[in-house]
Amino acid sequence: MPELPEVETVRQGLAQWVTGRRIAEVEVRHPRAIRRHPAGAAHFADVLVGTTVRDVRRRGKYLWLPLDSGDAVIGHLGMSGQLLLQPGAAPDEAHLRVRFRFADDGPELRFVDQRTFGGLSVSAGGAEMPTEIAHIARDPLDPEFSEAAFVAALRRRRTEVKRALLDQTLLSGVGNIYADEALWRARLHGARPADGLTGPAALRLLGHVRDVLGEAIKEGGTSFDALYVNVNGESGYFDRALNVYGRADQPCRRCGTPVRREAFMNRSSYSCPRCQPRPRRALQASG
């Protein structure tokens, strides 16, 4: 699933190409793509046609497009969603779900989603902050993110530190890939109890999270397959710089010990057994 760097890369591309443009036509080609908009496809299109996109913003892994009507389009890419800018004459993608045409007859915006786990909806009056995503915490790169509040909240969590990093109510945008990478840099095993971290250790971990996210954004995110691309259909390149994620049995880039893969929440965690020894006290339940 796309994490903060991938979604931010898409946001930057959308901001460049759709800000200030007036929506002339909306075509919903698959109802599942707007399942979070209970009023249905006709209403979805009606409230958007004639509005102008003011900006493109992000909260964690969610995007939203504030409109001059005061409403907002909310988007989540899910596992395979893509927001692509295409010439109107370009052939339709096999999994095209929603199409936006603009009054200037320039490139159209297409929501393409093979697995249909992503989706779009309209938030009434949600231009400044859609209520549907207001509960999601700020991300570590947000200028208004509070380091002190994060450190205090993290150290109160009676759960494993990796589970805490994935909790979108604590901080948003961090998923499996970047949690593993930040923990490797911090020399912490993901099973380390969060409430056992010192304040300085928690702050150092946050610094590594920020560094990893920032570096990934510069590389356009991480692409392991053709499902994640930017608005121009281009893949990201941060996978070349990953230190542990997806590198099971390969040598740790720091000490040479083979990277270990462990089952984690129906996914996998990657760590170095030497640099990140598993703690003696490991919590199994989240809290």
UniProtKB/Swiss-Prot annotation:
GO terms for molecular function: 8-oxo-7,8-dihydroguanine DNA N-glycosylase activity; class I DNA-(apurinic or apyrimidinic site) endonuclease activity; damaged DNA binding; zinc ion binding. Binds 1 zinc ion per subunit. Its cofactor is Zn(2+). SUPFAM superfamilies: Glucocorticoid receptor-like (DNA-binding domain), N-terminal domain of MutM-like DNA repair proteins, S13-like H2TH domain. A zinc finger (FPG-type) spans 243-277. The active site is at P2, E3, K61, R267. It holds the Pfam family zf-FPG_IleRS. Involved in base excision repair of DNA damaged by oxidation or by mutagenic agents. Acts as a DNA glycosylase that recognizes and removes damaged bases. Has a preference for oxidized purines, such as 7,8-dihydro-8-oxoguanine (8-oxoG). Has AP (apurinic/apyrimidinic) lyase activity and introduces nicks in the DNA strand. Cleaves the DNA backbone by beta-delta elimination to generate a single-strand break at the site of the removed base with both 3'- and 5'-phosphates. Monomer. Belongs to the FPG family. This is Formamidopyrimidine-DNA glycosylase.
